[in-house]
């Protein structure tokens, strides 16, 4: 039995309010600090890398990519697609280039994906957009040596949905070598009755078809060659931690999948991803090792 079904609305909302669980500062301050850290990191990245900003991947106004390109003559150039968090209703690609700071030095291309957050976009739209963004990246950058995904929070959900795509409906089948799913939500049912769903307006049917936890058989078909890292913060809420643990167990018990769980000490929902600006950070090192760039 899922614990969340026994919770009253207040407790459920608290469980799915990551800012309430940081040990570093108040809820309001941790969000302000998070946005500042992402913006400052992205500004640094734009100063270090060659950038191609607002590259279209579709017809929509919000369907744009920011590309951070290393100065390298190497033919071994991996590419990481980053999908931002913000509960499908905040943030944008404009503050999502921070992880390029350590990666471009190592000859890695970083692509930050824009998608139409709620209320403009709904869950089906966002999932379709990020899938199409991957197809577009492969078509534009066919020379890369490997394709990797990294997503945080809502972005980890979207990355997991990409891994669970039936690519027969698309013009190409991406060979995704690795994916970092950081503090994500993989079962959308618990958030249906919370404040998170107010702008999203998901029905149970929409939540089910967009829950990676329901799509593990499709992920096995599409992404069996992908190294998957499910990362969770020590100070994520118990329900956020359970989301990662349950999704990891579902993948780990599926024959033929390569998955590890990283329980990152001394982190909360926000600095677990902010620290990817640092080349010495544990998850940065893991990502570089996965790409053969450590």
UniProtKB/Swiss-Prot annotation:
<comment type="similarity">
    <text>Belongs to the kynurenine formamidase family.</text>
</comment>
<feature type="active site">
    <location>
        <position position="269"/>
    </location>
</feature>
<dbReference type="GO" id="GO:0004061">
    <property type="term" value="F:arylformamidase activity"/>
</dbReference>
<dbReference type="GO" id="GO:0019441">
    <property type="term" value="P:L-tryptophan catabolic process to kynurenine"/>
</dbReference>
<dbReference type="InterPro" id="IPR050300">
    <property type="entry name" value="GDXG_lipolytic_enzyme"/>
</dbReference>
<dbReference type="GO" id="GO:0034354">
    <property type="term" value="P:'de novo' NAD biosynthetic process from L-tryptophan"/>
</dbReference>
<dbReference type="Pfam" id="PF20434">
    <property type="entry name" value="BD-FAE"/>
</dbReference>
<dbReference type="GO" id="GO:0005634">
    <property type="term" value="C:nucleus"/>
</dbReference>
<comment type="pathway">
    <text>Amino-acid degradation; L-tryptophan degradation via kynurenine pathway; L-kynurenine from L-tryptophan: step 2/2.</text>
</comment>
<dbReference type="InterPro" id="IPR027519">
    <property type="entry name" value="KFase_ver/fungi-typ"/>
</dbReference>
<protein>
    <recommendedName>
        <fullName>Kynurenine formamidase</fullName>
        <ecNumber>3.5.1.9</ecNumber>
    </recommendedName>
</protein>
<feature type="active site">
    <location>
        <position position="236"/>
    </location>
</feature>
<keyword id="KW-0823">Tryptophan catabolism</keyword>
<comment type="subunit">
    <text>Homodimer.</text>
</comment>
<keyword id="KW-0963">Cytoplasm</keyword>
<keyword id="KW-0539">Nucleus</keyword>
<dbReference type="InterPro" id="IPR049492">
    <property type="entry name" value="BD-FAE-like_dom"/>
</dbReference>
<feature type="short sequence motif" description="HGGXW">
    <location>
        <begin position="84"/>
        <end position="88"/>
    </location>
</feature>
<keyword id="KW-0378">Hydrolase</keyword>
<dbReference type="GO" id="GO:0005829">
    <property type="term" value="C:cytosol"/>
</dbReference>
<dbReference type="InterPro" id="IPR029058">
    <property type="entry name" value="AB_hydrolase_fold"/>
</dbReference>
<feature type="active site" description="Nucleophile">
    <location>
        <position position="153"/>
    </location>
</feature>
<comment type="function">
    <text>Catalyzes the hydrolysis of N-formyl-L-kynurenine to L-kynurenine, the second step in the kynurenine pathway of tryptophan degradation. Kynurenine may be further oxidized to nicotinic acid, NAD(H) and NADP(H). Required for elimination of toxic metabolites.</text>
</comment>
<feature type="region of interest" description="Disordered">
    <location>
        <begin position="1"/>
        <end position="20"/>
    </location>
</feature>
<feature type="compositionally biased region" description="Basic and acidic residues">
    <location>
        <begin position="1"/>
        <end position="14"/>
    </location>
</feature>
């Amino acid at each position: 039995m899922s614990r969340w079904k026994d919770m009253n609305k207040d407790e459920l909302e608290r469980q799915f309010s990551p800012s309430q669980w940081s040990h570093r500062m108040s809820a309001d301050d941790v969000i302000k600090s998070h946005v500042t850290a992402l913006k400052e990191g992205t500004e640094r990245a734009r100063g270090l890398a060659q950038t191609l900003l607002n590259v279209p991947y579709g017809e929509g106004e919000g369907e744009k990519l920011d590309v951070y390109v290393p100065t390298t003559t190497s033919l071994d150039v991996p590419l990481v697609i980053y999908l931002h968090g913000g509960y499908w209703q905040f943030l944008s690609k404009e503050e999502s280039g921070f992880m390029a700071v350590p990666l471009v030095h190592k000859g890695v291309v970083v692509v930050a994906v824009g998608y139409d957050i709620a209320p403009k976009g709904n869950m089906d739209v966002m999932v379709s957009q990020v899938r199409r963004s991957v197809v577009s990246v492969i078509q534009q950058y066919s020379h890369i040596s490997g394709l990797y995904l990294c997503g945080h929070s809502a972005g980890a959900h979207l990355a997991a949905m990409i891994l669970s795509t039936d690519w027969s409906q698309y013009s190409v089948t991406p060979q995704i070598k690795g994916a970092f799913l950081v503090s994500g939500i993989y079962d959308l049912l618990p958030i249906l009755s919370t404040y998170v769903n107010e702008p999203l307006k998901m029905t149970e049917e929409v939540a089910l078809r967009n829950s990676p936890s329901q799509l593990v058989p499709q992920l096995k078909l599409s992404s069996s060659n992908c190294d998957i890292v499910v990362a969770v913060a020590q100070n994520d809420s118990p329900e956020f931690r359970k989301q990662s643990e349950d999704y990891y167990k579902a993948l780990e018990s599926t024959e033929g999948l390569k998955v590890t769980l990283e329980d990152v000490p001394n982190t909360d929902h926000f600095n677990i991803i902010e620290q990817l600006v640092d080349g010495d950070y544990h998850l940065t090192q893991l990502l570089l090792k996965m790409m053969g760039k450590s």
